[in-house]
Amino acid sequence: MSSTTVKNLVNQPYKYGFVTNIEADAIPRGLSEDVVRLISAKKNEPEFMLDFRLRAYRHWLTMAEPTWPAVHYPPIDYQDIIYYSAPKQSKKKLESLDEVDPALLETFEKLGIPLSEQKRLSNVAVDAIFDSVSIGTTFKEKLAEDGVIFCSISEALQEHPDLVQKYLGSVVPTADNFFAALNSAVFSDGSFVFIPKGVKCPMELSTYFRINNGDTGQFERTLIIAEEGASVSYLEGCTAPMYDTNQLHAAVVELVALDNADIKYSTVQNWYAGDENGKGGIYNFVTKRGLCKGVNSKISWTQVETGSAITWKYPSCVLVGDNSVGEFYSIALTNNKQQADTGTKMIHIGKNTRSIIISKGISAGNSANSYRGLVKMGPKAQGARNYSQCDSMLIGDRAAANTFPYIQVDNNTAKVEHEASTSKIGEDQLFYFAQRGISEEDAVSMLVSGFCKDVLNELPMEFAAEADKLLSLKLEGTVG
């Protein structure tokens, strides 16, 4: 495969890189206890929330930034970040989406996320987050008819403080890791979902994250609780403008599944990845963890990672309930000078727990793509089983792929299977396609799509085609 083809395929324009010119209410740069108190005061939070933040901030001051991921970047100046920026509004509390600034509605429509009543998606409820705040949530009232709570976490703190206090930090504690502690101190919004006992959520729930301000970090918090026998499918998407500087995105996601509950969490991550020389792009340092607390509970993570200059995330499952199930399906595509260190942890505690890991890494350009996984069978995980499959594909001759599996088994009745492969798109494959009149670009697209099909099949139907298209767009021109 010629280097020109590879270059053309990789260097696709990023169509979400525009900036919305809108007046913002932003606090000064820098992080201190006063800034933490200011964020809490701006959001008029209950006392327990301020205590939570301050505890996290004090922990964070004692922690060191992790150096073990296989990624390299210049030191981050945490005093040069704006930790809260929100679009200026005429009213403190908006009663409906009709009161949202038209420029914001237009931004989300341009991103393919219409929020106005006439144009909104009919079977998907959306929480739209812009910089540090949620600007609106669709179908809240309709979902409430089934007892489903879907709102921003700021609203949940006002309307359902007991639920937030009970579950916030129960899966990812404030001192869990450096970036989770930072998030716990300064997060300003995110989504809250509560599915009551026995309810199957009647529609897909989705949150769309948009970073706009070039000096602002985004630190959202997502908390999803499924009570006994409840089920929900949730999708998140994200984009950001093209800046020459890097922005920090440090989110935390906590999922709690009680007896016989089922949570499916899907991500299509398309943050700005920087230019072909590695200038600009988002640092995506995220902590995601699900707790299968109840018997027969199930949590499934599906992710398609194509953006960010640097990605550092490991959506994980802690399988406490007997017969609980954890699943992780991932596609991580890197090109140009992107770096990704992603993977999962499956921690088996209960009896007869099961987990499956399917990871597909695709490396093109000068990028580096690492899979890092932990499978841990606890001493009481009688009859537990895990199956892991980690496949890497290299496009071109300058990309790198690494796999770091870690397996710990403390119960002799547990079974663990692990297989891994590395492949490269070869001249013989492209020649075979050419013989049938298929261009090199189409051939690469078809090979990648086939390589990823096990994961794409796990996405909700309406998003699978979008993700497949996104992979093709990201690779257009990698051959030439």
Swiss-Prot record:
Transmembrane portions of the chain? none
Signal peptide as annotated in the record: none
Q: Which GO terms describe its biological process?
A: iron-sulfur cluster assembly
UniProt-listed SUPFAM superfamilies: Stabilizer of iron transporter SufD
**One Pfam assignment:** SUFBD_core
Question: Which domain of life does this protein belong to?
Answer: Bacteria
InterPro entries in UniProt:
Fe-S_cluster_assembly_SufBD, SUF_FeS_clus_asmbl_SufB, SUF_FeS_clus_asmbl_SufBD_core, SUF_FeS_clus_asmbl_SufBD_sf, SufBD_N
Q: Which family does it belong to?
A: Belongs to the iron-sulfur cluster assembly SufBD family.
Q: Which NCBIfam families match?
A: PRK11814.1 (NF008773), sufB (TIGR01980)
Official protein name in the record: Iron-sulfur cluster assembly SufBD family protein slr0074
Which organism is the protein's source?
Synechocystis sp. (strain ATCC 27184 / PCC 6803 / Kazusa)
